[in-house]
Amino acid sequence: MRGSPRNLCRVQGMIEEIVNRLRGKLIVSCQPVPESPFDNVASVVAYARAAEASGASGLRIEGAANVAATAQASTLPVIGLIKRDLDDSPVRITPFLEDVAALCDAGAAIVAVDATDRRRPVPAAELIGEIKRRGRIAMADISTLAEARNALAAGADIIGTTMSGYTGEGPTPKDPDLDLVAHCSRLGSFLIAEGRYNSPQQAGEAIRAGADAVVVGSAITRPEHITGWFRDAVESAAKPSSPVLAFDIGGTKTLAALVRGREILERRVMTTPASVGSESWIGAIASLSADWQGRYQRAAIAVTGRVDGEIWSSLNPETLAIPPDYPLGRRMGAALGAPVEVINDAQAAAWGENRFGAARGRDMVFLTISSGIGGGIVLGGRLIRGARGIAGSLGQVLVAGPSGFVRLETLASGFGIAKMALEAGHAGDARSVFSAAAAGEGWARRILLDAASQLAAAVAGLQAIVDPECIVIGGGVGMADGFLDMLREALGSHSAVMRPDIVAAELGADAGIIGVADLAATYFS
């Protein structure tokens, strides 16, 4: 057959026809768990027929009897293989020439062989040559790029990444080897991605990485594995998780708590120590939770300012002076003896309100309006921290003030309201301004309306840029009596499409500590 030009043309035509049928398509591996209730010819054929009816374009079948029955029952091209457990070789897939013969006689259009560089009874090149001699398509199951090159040099028609992760002595990886797919895609041969493709997303990623087709097995035809995945997920979720040790460090007070989900199991409050970042400062905060050691495995800190990786720094030094490039997570981790996640307090509060509060599951922006103005953004179930850790920091946006451009929080925060009151001849803090407005003082109401107007313009711009489903307002100023009504009134001067759905926060002052604990328990774990 090898020497006949007519036969060579026929084989080449068959190769082109089959690879064209498989290009950009799904191949289903119908290989039951050994000795399972489905480990019989009838079940394999049933799997194959169901796969074909559901749109699969190829089948991967183990065992000559299964191949023969499937080839009779299905119109799809069959990749055939025989698995053996050998005493003197780790190679399992089609290790002998007689295996190749049996698969060809059974009707396999493609014969798969282990082409890894390991001790074996028959060289891979001989197996590939025998497949070609018998007029079938040779598929080489490899684990490395070098093995793929060697298989192609030996005449393989198709490369499969089947063996990646299965030839070493370490644990089998959880995810498929997309890097190997990308490297092998540059070799120019027909490439089938195979091995641990357990979700539609992973199969799609394989095609985008350069695969011509994808084999999926366990996720479709091994109910024992699928049941185990769901069982583990359900039982894991049902187990009470260890609480997270969470801190919310502010300019004036620090809260420590043990948190599980949205439940604060225990809490303690102290005045934030002076000398931010010093050894005594770290020690004082860590001592707040000293007798909780052993009750948590992770810790998390919500802080004002900018958090970029593990570095904490000031966005507005007037709010809290922080040493330059301070590695808060590393310092607190050493003091606590546990891994520590650090996140901006407003971003943590945004996550808390999205998971458990006023904006459950919605695309949202959270704004805390208190002594300063901070914010956080959650879109598509993901907290958006930004390239520099400042996403949502609306208070730092420059706006036009009486004497030039200033930060928004200079005009619309608690500090800003108190400053405007002082300039109008009325000493006191933001709380006293709200009290005066409630008592009918016109000067106080004008200051609050000015602050609400500045905030409304910024919020309308935020709606245009992010377009969230809602904007949640929290913080001492934001939640003060009457302020949200003033904000909504000020937004009335903007077009309807620019007016966001303004929602009051539900978690109050606990949003940050609940959010940062949940991030440590779920998002970063």
UniProtKB/Swiss-Prot annotation:
Catalytic activity: an N-acyl-D-glucosamine 6-phosphate = an N-acyl-D-mannosamine 6-phosphate; an N-acyl-D-mannosamine + ATP = an N-acyl-D-mannosamine 6-phosphate + ADP + H(+)
Sample GO molecular function, one term: ATP binding
Domain of life: Bacteria
Residues bound to ATP: 246-253, 372-379
Pathways per UniProt: Amino-sugar metabolism; N-acetylneuraminate degradation; D-fructose 6-phosphate from N-acetylneuraminate: step 2/5; Amino-sugar metabolism; N-acetylneuraminate degradation; D-fructose 6-phosphate from N-acetylneuraminate: step 3/5
Region (ManNAc-6-P epimerase): 1-241
EC number: 5.1.3.9, 2.7.1.60
InterPro entries: Aldolase_TIM (IPR013785), ATPase_NBD (IPR043129), NanE (IPR007260), RibuloseP-bd_barrel (IPR011060), ROK (IPR000600)
One GO cellular component, as annotated: cytosol
UniProt keyword terms in alphabetical order: ATP-binding, Carbohydrate metabolism, Isomerase, Kinase, Multifunctional enzyme, Nucleotide-binding, Transferase
Function: Converts N-acetylmannosamine-6-phosphate (ManNAc-6-P) to N-acetylglucosamine-6-phosphate (GlcNAc-6-P).
Family the UniProt entry places it in: In the N-terminal section; belongs to the NanE family. In the C-terminal section; belongs to the ROK (NagC/XylR) family. NanK subfamily.
PANTHER family: N-ACETYLMANNOSAMINE-6-PHOSPHATE 2-EPIMERASE-RELATED (PTHR36204:SF1)
Name of protein: Bifunctional enzyme NanE/NanK
Organism: Brucella suis biovar 1 (strain 1330)
Taxonomic lineage: Bacteria, Pseudomonadati, Pseudomonadota, Alphaproteobacteria, Hyphomicrobiales
